[in-house]
Design a protein with these regions (language model features):
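Short beta-to-alpha transition helix within the HATPase_c
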Residues: 1-17
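Conserved short strand/loop->alpha-helix "switch" segment adjacent to the catalytic nucleotide/phosphoryl-transfer site
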Residues: 21-42
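Conserved ATP-binding N-box helix of the HATPase_c
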Residues: 35-58
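Short beta-strand/loop element within the Bergerat-fold HATPase_c
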Residues: 59-71
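Glycine-rich/acidic phosphate-handling loop/turn and adjacent ATP-lid/helix
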Residues: 71-103, 142-144
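Glycine-rich nucleotide-binding loop
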Residues: 83, 125-132, 138
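Glycine-rich ATP-binding loops of the HATPase_c
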Residues: 116-127
Length: 146
């Protein structure tokens, strides 16, 4: 239910901003995140995508794909991008926002992902940004729910 609430709220925001949103969501019976971590993860990746789309003048879009694969839940979010990326000396992405209140989104994604034994990868390109998140799904819990 919390994922539905986050997606509905962000869909409304995207619609209001003229961003095309496509999604495909297949959830396992044993969802690997708490409601708080679910909200944190999806709010951050969707907010980042919405912000990036605002710098794309023509036909901004976001695509979200959530599906189980083996013992992992794969979350892939891609969005149109104007490629205005900033990096630190280590090659890590930096926030495009100014001020100390900004730049926590990817750190929160990393915290949530790593806390449950998962990982994430970002793939910025000239016209698209993709984040792929893999979260382990407990097969024992899933079998017990059958």
């Amino acid at each position: 239910p919390i994922l539905d609430a986050v997606l509905s709220l962000k869909y409304y925001t995207m619609e209001h901003k003229g961003i095309r949103f496509e999604h495909s969501v297949y959830l396992p019976t044993a969802f690997p995140l708490s409601p708080l971590d679910t909200s944190t993860l999806f709010t951050n990746i969707l907010d980042n995508a919405i912000e990036a789309c605002q710098s794309c003048p023509a036909a901004p879009w976001i695509h979200l794909d959530i599906k189980p694969k083996g013992d992992m839940l794969l979350i892939t979010l891609s969005n149109s991008s104007a490629a205005n990326y900033r990096y630190n000396k280590k090659g890590n992405l930096l926030s495009t926002k100014d001020g100390k209140e900004h730049g926590y989104g990817l750190r929160q994604v990393a915290r949530v992902t790593e806390a449950c034994g998962g990982f994430y990868q970002v793939t910025p390109s000239a016209d698209k940004f993709t984040i792929t998140i893999a979260l382990p799904v407990s097969l024992e819990v899933e079998r017990n729910n059958l």
